[in-house]
Amino acid sequence: MMRKLSPGSKIVLASHNAGKLREFSTLLAESGITVISAAELDLPEPEETEETFTGNAAIKALAAARASGLPALADDSGFCVSALDNRPGVYSARWGGPTKDMQVAMERVHREMGDNPDQRAFFVAALCLAWPDGETRTVQGECHGTVVWPPRGDHGHGYDPMFVPEGESRTFAEMSEAEKNAVSHRGRALTAFLNTCLDTSTQKTERK
């Protein structure tokens, strides 16, 4: 039988990114999952050596689960631009240089796109849930849209200010957290994660 998390479980988010911690905590709170960050536990960040989002998510989740003794959830996400052959992709954070400055990263995307009329882009989020014994479960979500320049908005993080999702006129960074979560790659991956990895039988029993 596939192992699942019970409501009330505590998991480690295998990330030192405060923005991601806030986003995941909000998304998982309704399901009764308590999230603590790898930074709180002072866990090291493993090197991401895979060429896929799911591969890198698994590296991070397994490292955090084994180090903490708790189930761990890792996300590996990236920005894929059609005109750049879907780069920066898994190297999205590295495009910000040694300090991962996302303003630098966005300027590089804009510079490399040049006058290319193809403005299509999409975000990918892969989530991996790992247990200390090495068992893993992986899901993925995508959100398609277009690149805009100059960047707009003060919310969100990463490449959010230069991306407008399909059906919207605002960038991710111009949306509220709830609005973004409803359509984002991470929100879609979380929905798949909850459907796949959360044991809802307890909740159903409690409602009766």
Curated annotation (Swiss-Prot):
The active site is at D76 (proton acceptor). Belongs to the HAM1 NTPase family. It comes from Gluconobacter oxydans (strain 621H) (Gluconobacter suboxydans). This is dITP/XTP pyrophosphatase. One of its GO terms (molecular function) is nucleotide binding. It catalyses: XTP + H2O = XMP + diphosphate + H(+); dITP + H2O = dIMP + diphosphate + H(+); ITP + H2O = IMP + diphosphate + H(+). CDD domains: HAM1. Its cofactor is Mg(2+). Mg(2+) binds at E47, D76. Substrate binds at S15, H16, N17, A18, G19, K20, S77, H157, G158, Y159, D160, K180, H185, R186. Binds 1 Mg(2+) ion per subunit. It holds the Pfam family Ham1p_like. GO terms for cellular component: cytosol. Gene3D superfamilies: 3.90.950.10. Pyrophosphatase that catalyzes the hydrolysis of nucleoside triphosphates to their monophosphate derivatives, with a high preference for the non-canonical purine nucleotides XTP (xanthosine triphosphate), dITP (deoxyinosine triphosphate) and ITP. Seems to function as a house-cleaning enzyme that removes non-canonical purine nucleotides from the nucleotide pool, thus preventing their incorporation into DNA/RNA and avoiding chromosomal lesions. Its EC number is 3.6.1.66.
